[in-house]
């Protein structure tokens, strides 16, 4: 589209949740308006089509559904201690300020059967995550000389050697008319 640059990137999601692509297909869109008119970004004017012409609409970021599993870690644990030492095998998990004594020196057996399920804890988190919303492309105007970028989300696309085309309508803000459409082909593999 003349004077409006549209760049689309797949496999650009490197944020939380790290396994988002198992539930949705994020595509990073960057639009630069080099025209002398204000244009508008509208979700209902962004879509993918397959070779058969089937349309896959953008899912507004606040409507992405599903859950992903994320690891849970304690960032700043609180330890109350009074004349306390810790098991020798727990040294690497203990806060730095407790490490000076080297841990309990007596017999203290480690029971791997008990601790195995607790080594890594995962929890289900509902989509969309706060980071998905923060990194989403917002609907709205792009003034002349300005740019906007962010992720748009589609349903999970099955991998295979299918050709998909991303269609982004460039809409004139004043009239609401489509000035043109950027068509960007992709191979889903």
Please place each PLM-identified region on the residue numbering.
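Structured domain cores in non-transmembrane regions
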Residues: 46-100
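Surface-exposed edge beta-strand/loop patches
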Residues: 1, 45-52, 93, 102-189
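Asparagine-centered strand-capping/turn motif at beta-strand->loop junctions
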Residues: 29-38
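Second-shell loop/turn segments in exported
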Residues: 14-18, 35, 137-141
């Amino acid at each position: 589209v003349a004077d409006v640059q549209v760049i689309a990137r797949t496999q650009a999601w490197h944020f939380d949740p790290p396994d988002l692509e198992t539930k949705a297909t994020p595509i990073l869109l960057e639009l630069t308006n080099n025209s002398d008119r204000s244009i508008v970004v509208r979700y209902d004017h962004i879509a993918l089509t397959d070779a058969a012409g089937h349309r896959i609409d953008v899912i507004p970021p606040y409507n992405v559904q599903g859950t992903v599993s994320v690891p849970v870690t304690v960032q700043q644990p609180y330890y109350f201690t009074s004349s306390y030492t810790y098991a020798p095998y727990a040294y690497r998990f203990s806060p730095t300020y407790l490490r000076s004594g080297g841990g309990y020196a007596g017999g203290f057996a480690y029971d791997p059967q008990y601790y195995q399920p607790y080594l890594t804890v995962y929890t289900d988190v509902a989509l969309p995550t706060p980071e998905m919303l923060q990194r989403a492309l917002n609907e709205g105007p792009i003034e002349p000389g300005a740019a906007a970028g962010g992720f748009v989300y589609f349903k999970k696309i099955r991998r295979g050697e299918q050709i998909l085309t991303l269609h982004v309508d460039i809409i004139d803000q004043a009239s609401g008319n489509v000035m043109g459409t950027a068509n960007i082909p992709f191979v889903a593999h």
